[in-house]
């Protein structure tokens, strides 16, 4: 099922990009 695979790929990307953006915003705020 390509749709299911792309869905899990999207969740994996979101779960890795979101914390990275959050940490980046915190670093910018600290500077």
Swiss-Prot record:
The keyword Chloroplast applies. One of its GO terms (biological process) is photosynthesis. InterPro entries: Cyt_b6/f_cplx_su6 (IPR007802). Pfam families: PetL. Belongs to the PetL family. Component of the cytochrome b6-f complex, which mediates electron transfer between photosystem II (PSII) and photosystem I (PSI), cyclic electron flow around PSI, and state transitions. PetL is important for photoautotrophic growth as well as for electron transfer efficiency and stability of the cytochrome b6-f complex. This is Cytochrome b6-f complex subunit 6.
């Amino acid at each position: 099922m390509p749709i299911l695979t792309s869905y899990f790929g999207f969740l994996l990307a979101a779960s890795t990009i979101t914390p990275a953006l959050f940490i980046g915003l915190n670093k910018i705020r600290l500077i």
